Regions:
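Carbohydrate-interacting/catalytic domains
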Residues: 1-62, 74, 79, 87, ...
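Conserved short loop/turn motifs at secondary-structure junctions
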Residues: 107, 351-357, 875-876
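C-terminal EAL-domain catalytic cores of bacterial cyclic di-GMP phosphodiesterases
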Residues: 83-105
């Protein structure tokens, strides 16, 4: 069945955005191309997906597994396919009425291997480069030796050692010189090329007769290079002159080298001499002097944290941040993307890491403005953008864009382009209302729906077990604080230093703050950032007031920083707070205000990566109480979500962000939805878990290794390992089955986890002995030997966990499909998916098997009763066909009732009876249409610890779903089994549906009123 026709196609311009019905994320790379995706379109359509959700596919560095290291925003990635391949994929989607959401990367670009011509221009021409303003570079850093230069921390050893080992090689290619370092290629600046060309000039003059045309041309080229505008000249006309003349001289030299053998031999000999001779350190002096004249300063990679002077994506040296707030940068990076939008090939955008942008709100407005201009060009108009006085500047080329009235988020149809933000919301944080988007990528939904299956009663006993087993008593907020401080010290200290110097300049401008020292200000900033409760604020430097949420965030951070630093004067923290909240001193002039606002913008761009690295990539691997909570968008300190809290979140979502994605697994999640569902079961079985981990430690302590006088792995890492095994244990744990490669996966995962934790080993300073101890411990635990008592014990413990995890997975999947929002599926998760963090979750997916299974299910649906099919699938639940069946049936139903699920009212349904706390139920209602959703939760107590299934009256007893006058029908049809369920009178009046009847043969239910049935 084809999806609803796409309104945004070439020749048929839409006035409103296409909002997906359901999305499916595909990871495109050289191993999975446009052609591979095109072949999947019929399967995705049959599954019920309406929109393909594609990872970035613009030209990235060669071999990129993810596409986030784009080197050319104006071209497709040739490893993924040609323009014709891309067009064929888009045509296949269009033929079935499907849309495409493209993941776009505005924050940064890949710069590692010389393919990025913008970055190459910067390395060649410095501040005088045509693209110098495209990147966020501090041309006036603290270290004076780096003035008007870029630190390149790419060397594997100290610079002198690398130079004298002959690893830096000068080459002549065409009319230009380059420096090669293994697979990296760096340009030689035009003015410094004079050192090379002049080195043997006298010898060349002796070879060629005076007045020889080749010699005259050679000397003319030298003169031209010497007279180029300096690379520090940044006036546009001088930049253009330098660029133009340098290219002319390069071509002239290339032609001369090709035509004159004496010139070519002379230059080649110079290159040979400059490259030195290993074993003779002085022979590298000339090359050293040449390198010292370059825009870039080559350095050992370890110095990056302290001295790098270009903004990066987090602490990744190979990803340089873009200045997306500049009109030219926006225009050049979005030309191809917006062309795809205009042609209808792309119907929505997912914006990666908007928290890294200078001003996310203005960026999103610029996207909508660009789409509006496309619509206006063909005579269209969007009601949300019709004229009137209420208009707001985007800051991009001075264009104007109208805003929706009031402080209300945009609903579907308000903004002309469907846009999603990859925004991780902190606990209690609300989306910025000024963002011209339709929602997020769904991490807040992931946290809410996942928490519904965590038993709050397990918090105290699991905390006690964790502390007793590991000996750790540090509270989670303290773990986060220490982790963020560590990141500021070892990964992002250069960013902190830049902020500190900017704040010191600001302090010097006023008599009330000039006595604060640079050291004191850096310390205060470090503490405030470490105490920051959210990823970042969104204070607009063009306004004089700060929104309530931003103000509260700053005030909380400063208050906690004061509390943690009683020996530090409160006045310095108050100064930081006043600067961040735009509270100017009485005598502040306009230059002060401009500098203050520039500082605030920079500060906001630093807190986000510090939080991401400190929280997601450090604290989440240090605090292992219940690791299903250690997930992007989740809070490990929030132990469970009540049914009432879930309903409130869904109601808010329907009112504000009904077009946002509802995700349960993504390419960035630490664990798949099915892994988390299993681990969350431990919250229901704290006593059994405490006994099990104690027993396993005693069985496995003989496999520990002594490293630096301590047992390895330590107790915290061991505790993480056991939870990981609970979550990822194969469905076929036999030596011939999945267990064969399982040990390798767990070894790789635990190595990554312990390095991310940065306690005993790290990526920056790997501890080879500890890493080896981890691998040995895992290998011995999982060795399929007859005498391995641990495996036998673990398998027995895990059997009911797997069954209970299955129930949680099915329940959260149905909730995702039916709750407010757009259900999003990560590739492969329509069957059981027991993957861990990347790269484990980015492996190949067996789509042939999934296509075959879906066809078999469709065939069986046509030939047998639903109830028989449902019972059979439940009996053999381990093969995952049951999950695919649920997804297929629910998505198809959702597509048939799209208006109901997109616009319908969200109605929480009450449950009465002795098992009421084990049910989450709601209805979606629109006019005469309605659908009821019922799922079980916390099923361990219902099933004797997972030994059975929560089906029938024997389990549900007197529990009834109260209809409470919401619905007049007396009979309801259940989608998965086809059963008809009659309502019954309830004590105290009203009618209800018995849970034992709703969940008689299948563990979740999706119902609709039967036509013509009325009470």
């Amino acid at each position: 069945m084809a999806a609803e026709p796409s309104p945004a196609r070439a020749g048929a311009v839409a006035l409103a955005p296409r909002v997906p019905g359901a999305t499916y994320r595909l990871q495109l790379h050289q191993g999975f191309t446009f052609d591979d995706a095109r072949r999947l379109v019929p399967y995705l359509d049959a599954l019920g997906v309406t929109d393909l959700y594609a990872s970035p596919y613009l030209r990235a560095r060669p071999g990129s597994p993810h596409g986030y290291d784009i080197v050319d925003h104006g071209a497709l990635n040739p490893e993924i396919g040609t323009a014709a391949d891309h067009a064929a994929l888009c045509a296949a989607l269009e033929a079935r009425g499907m849309g495409q959401i493209l993941d776009v990367v505005p924050n940064h670009m890949g710069i590692s291997h010389g393919q990025n011509r913008w970055w190459r221009d910067v390395l060649e021409n410095g501040p005088g480069a045509a693209y110098a303003d495209f990147f966020d570079i501090d041309w006036d850093p603290v270290k004076r030796e780096l003035a008007n230069r870029v630190l390149l921390p790419i060397l594997a050893d100290q610079y002198g050692q690398v130079l004298e080992s002959g690893e830096l090689v000068l080459t002549l290619e065409g009319g230009g010189f380059q420096v090669r370092y293994h697979d990296r290629v760096l340009p030689v600046s035009p003015e410094s090329a004079t050192d090379i060309l002049a080195y043997r000039l006298d010898a060349l003059a002796g070879t060629l007769a005076e007045g020889h045309p080749d010699l005259l041309e050679y000397q003319s080229i030298l003169t031209g290079l010497r007279n180029l505008p300096a690379r520090t000249e940044t006036a546009p006309e001088r930049v253009a002159e330098r660029t133009r003349e340098a290219e002319v001289l390069r071509r002239r030299l290339a032609r001369l080298l090709e035509e004159s053998e004496p010139v070519r031999l002379s230059v080649e000999e110079t290159v040979r001499v400059l490259n030195g001779k290993r074993g003779d350190p002085r022979s590298f002096d000339l090359l050293d002097r040449l390198l010292d004249r370059q825009v870039y300063r080559l350095a050992y990679w370890r110095v990056a944290a302290d001295e790098v002077n270009y903004r990066r994506f987090f602490d990744i040296n190979e990803l340089a941040a873009l200045r997306m707030e500049r009109p030219a940068v926006f225009r050049e990076t979005h030309r191809l993307i917006l062309r795809f939008v205009e042609e209808g090939k792309v119907t929505g955008l997912r914006v990666d890491h908007p928290d890294g942008l200078h001003d996310p709100a203005r960026y999103f407005l610029a996207l909508q403005q660009a789409r509006l201009e496309q619509l206006s060009a063909v005579g269209g108009s969007s009601p949300a953008f019709e004229g009137g006085p209420d208009r707001e500047r985007t800051g991009v080329e001075g264009t104007l864009v109208a805003s929706p009235a009031g402080d209300v988020p945009a609903a579907a149809g308000v903004w002309p382009l469907y846009v999603l933000a990859e925004k991780v919301l902190g606990r209690g944080e609300r989306m910025p209302t000024r963002w011209a988007i339709h929602g997020t990528t769904g991490y807040e939904f992931l946290a809410t729906v996942g928490g519904l299956f965590v038993d709050p009663a397990g918090a105290r006993p699991l905390t006690a077990t964790y502390r007793a087993f590991t000996g750790l008593r540090t509270l989670y907020p303290d773990v986060v604080y220490a982790s963020k401080q560590l990141i500021l010290d070892v990964a992002l200290s250069s960013e902190l230093a830049v902020l500190g110097r900017a704040l010191a300049r600001l302090a010097e401008r006023h008599r009330h703050s000039r006595d604060f020292t640079l050291r004191g200000l850096i310390h205060a900033l470090r503490e405030v950032i470490a105490c920051f409760p959210l990823y970042r604020t969104y204070i607009d430097g063009t306004e004089t007031t700060v929104e309530l949420q931003d103000r509260a965030c700053v005030e909380v951070a400063v208050a906690f920083a004061k509390r943690r630093n009683p020996a530090t004067s409160a006045s310095i923290f108050d100064f930081v707070k006043n600067v961040l909240l735009l509270r100017d001193p009485d005598s502040a002039d306009e230059p002060y205000r401009q500098e203050q606002r520039a500082f605030v913008r920079k500060f906001q761009q630093v807190t986000a990566p510090v939080t991401a690295k400190g929280l997601e990539d450090t604290a989440f691997y240090r605090y292992n109480r219940l690791v299903s909570l250690n997930e992007v968008g989740s809070d490990p300190d929030r132990f469970g979500v009540s049914v009432e809290e879930f309903h409130q979140a869904c109601a808010t979502r329907q009112a504000r962000w009904a077009a946002g994605l509802s995700a349960t697994s993504t390419h960035d999640t630490k664990r798949s939805e099915d892994v988390r569902a299993r681990i969350s079961v431990l919250s229901e079985l704290p006593t059994a878990w405490r006994s099990a981990v104690g027993r396993w430690h005693r069985l496995n302590q003989r496999h520990l290794t002594v490293v630096d006088g301590q047992a390895a792995p330590d107790r915290n890492d061991e505790y993480l390992l056991y939870q990981t095994l609970v979550g990822a244990w194969p469905l076929d744990p036999t030596p011939e089955g999945a267990l064969a490669g399982f040990a390798d996966r767990i070894q790789a995962y635990l190595t990554k986890a312990t390095r991310e934790a940065k306690v005993h080993t790290s990526w920056v300073s790997p501890n080879a002995e500890y890493d080896a101890a981890i691998r040995t411990f895992v290998a011995r635990l999982l060795e399929p030997a007859p005498g391995n008592r641990f495996l036998l014990d673990f398998a027995a413990f895990h059997e009911p966990i797997a069954r209970l995890g299955m129930l949680g997975s099915l329940a959260q999947t149905l909730l995702k499909i039916c709750a407010p929002g757009v259900p999003d599926f990560y590739q492969g998760t329509e069957l059981w998916n027991l993957c861990l963090v990347d790269p484990d979750n980015r492996g190949p997916v067996d789509f042939e098997a999934r296509t075959r299974i879906l066809a078999e299910l469709s065939s069986r649906l046509a030939g047998e009763e639903r109830v028989a099919l449902a019972k059979d699938l439940l009996t053999r639940w381990r093969d995952g066909h049951m999950k695919l069946y649920l997804i297929h049936q629910a998505l198809q139903y959702r597509r048939r009732r799209l208006a109901l699920f997109r616009e319908g009212e969200y109605v929480p349904l009450a449950v009465a009876g002795s098992r009421d706390e084990h049910v989450c139920a709601f209805a979606r209602r629109r006019d005469t249409e309605a659908a009821l959703v019922v799922v079980p939760r916390l099923c361990a107590r219902l099933t004797e610890g997972g030994r059975g299934l929560p089906l029938g009256d024997a389990v549900w007893s007197d529990t009834v779903l109260a209809l409470e006058g919401h619905f007049e029908a007396t009979t309801y049809r259940e989608l998965f089994t086809g059963a008809s369920v009659e309502s019954v009178p309830m004590e105290g009046g009203g009618r209800g549906l018995r849970l034992g009847a709703l969940l008689a043969d299948f563990p979740v239910a999706l119902l609709e009123p039967s036509a013509g049935s009325r009470s």
